[in-house]
Amino acid sequence: MFDVLMYLFESYIHNETEMRVDQDTLTDDLTRAGFHRNDIYSALSWLEKLADIQEGQTAPLYLASDPLAMRIYTQDEELRLDAECRGFLLFLEQMQVLNLETREMIIERVMALETQEFDLEDLKWVILMVLFNVPGCENAYQQMEELLFEVNDGYVQ
């Protein structure tokens, strides 16, 4: 499923390719590219739920909190997001690339992935996908892109 999301993001979304394709055509294209239908349907469902969150139809579970409060992760979240991933999310919050809402969207979308293995590189792509699709986060997306693609040394690589 994550491979399908990456392919879609790199091939269509990130490259600003016109994406006015119906789901059946897209599914056929992805099948021809070598992806399994179950993974395709899971990825499309994941993207639909991301769109629902952005449109306010569904909200991740979070409450308004003190901006200085520390996020406590559930046991399942800690299993999926190792210390390096959690540290990177905190780093992005401190750099004001992420805010409470976008952080929670990212965590919710990470937890919705059907994968057993998840690392920092995967998290970076999920962050890009979420920020790309959230209205008003264009600057945060651009900052994240710069962190990922233009920095050769240091913590973020």
Curated annotation (Swiss-Prot):
The cross-references to Pfam families, in alphabetical order and at most eight, read:
DUF494 (PF04361)
Taxonomy, superkingdom: Bacteria
Family assignment? Belongs to the Smg family.
NCBIfam families, alphabetized: PRK03430.1
- Entry protein name: Protein Smg
Q: Which organism is it from?
A: Pectobacterium atrosepticum (strain SCRI 1043 / ATCC BAA-672)
- The gene name reads smg
